[in-house]
């Protein structure tokens, strides 16, 4: 087991790599290219630039969270293969730069969700929190407005202002995507990326093999994943 810390990049994180380096036992960071839109290919040059910045601090890039999945893939539109091809190329480039762990999610519209971004603990510290009852009281179209008041300048993955400006379009886009359809599209996606991304290493991709880890809130149970993609998970 390795101790790591999430790092949002020098442009977006108030915590510096120098500060992270001082935490006992922490040897790496989990990060991403926060200024790269879902669906775009991550070039080896950009990946190396990110790695070099981290390694100069005495840490290393332990993994990526996330290479975001384009909405066309989740919804299953006619152009999804273009974005899946871009995703595969990104995984290959990460592997060639010696980064072999990628976390992704397949959650619709809002990416990951919290009901509070700064719940106060008894010791005075603050933490993220999730309460389904609170979420149920929020009108979906107003969720960004409700949550953003506590962001304090932080840009949450999947909650970028330019994305949330189109929240009504996103709801329209996903209106016919029920649980079954979402899992069908997940199956299609996993079967496409598995040769490079899900523990199955072919000769073509051997040098760039990458392990992909699905975010838990996708609500994928082991049996469903095994059925969907024949991907062995622990």
Where are these regions (language model features)?
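A short beta-strand-loop structural module common to alpha/beta enzyme folds
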Residues: 27-37
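Boundary/entry segment of secreted carbohydrate-active catalytic domains
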Residues: 1-12
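Conserved beta-strand positions in the central sheet of alpha/beta enzyme cores
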Residues: 28-30, 63, 103
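Conserved beta-strand edge residues that scaffold enzyme active sites
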Residues: 34-35, 68, 108-109
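Active-site-adjacent substrate/metal-binding segments within catalytic domains
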Residues: 62-71, 77
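Active-site acidic/histidine proton-transfer and metal-coordination neighborhood
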Residues: 11, 73-234
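Acidic (Asp/Glu)-rich catalytic clusters
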Residues: 17-25, 42-62, 92-96, 192-200, ...
């Amino acid at each position: 087991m390795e101790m790591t810390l999430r790092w949002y990049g020098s442009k977006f994180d108030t915590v510096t790599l120098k500060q992270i380096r001082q935490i006992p036992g922490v040897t790496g960071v989990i990060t991403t290219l926060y200024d790269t839109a879902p669906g775009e290919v991550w070039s080896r040059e950009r990946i190396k630039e990110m790695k070099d910045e981290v390694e100069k601090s005495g840490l290393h890039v332990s993994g990526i969270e996330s290479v975001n999945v384009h909405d066309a893939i989740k919804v299953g539109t006619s152009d999804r293969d273009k974005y899946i091809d871009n995703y595969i190329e990104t995984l290959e480039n990460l592997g060639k730069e010696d980064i072999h762990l990628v976390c992704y999610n397949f959650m619709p519209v809002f990416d990951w969700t919290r009901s509070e971004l700064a719940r106060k603990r008894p010791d005075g510290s603050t933490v993220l929190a999730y309460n389904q009852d609170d979420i149920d009281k929020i009108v979906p179209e107003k969720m960004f407005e409700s949550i953003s008041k506590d962001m304090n300048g932080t840009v949450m993955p999947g909650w970028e202002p330019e994305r949330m400006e189109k929240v009504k379009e996103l709801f329209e886009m996903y209106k016919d995507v029920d649980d079954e359809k979402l899992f069908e599209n997940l199956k299609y996606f996993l079967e496409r990326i598995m040769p490079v991304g899900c523990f199955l290493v072919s000769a073509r991709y051997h040098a760039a093999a990458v392990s992909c880890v699905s975010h838990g809130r996708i609500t994928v149970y082991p049996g469903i994943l095994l059925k969907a993609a024949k991907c062995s998970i622990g």
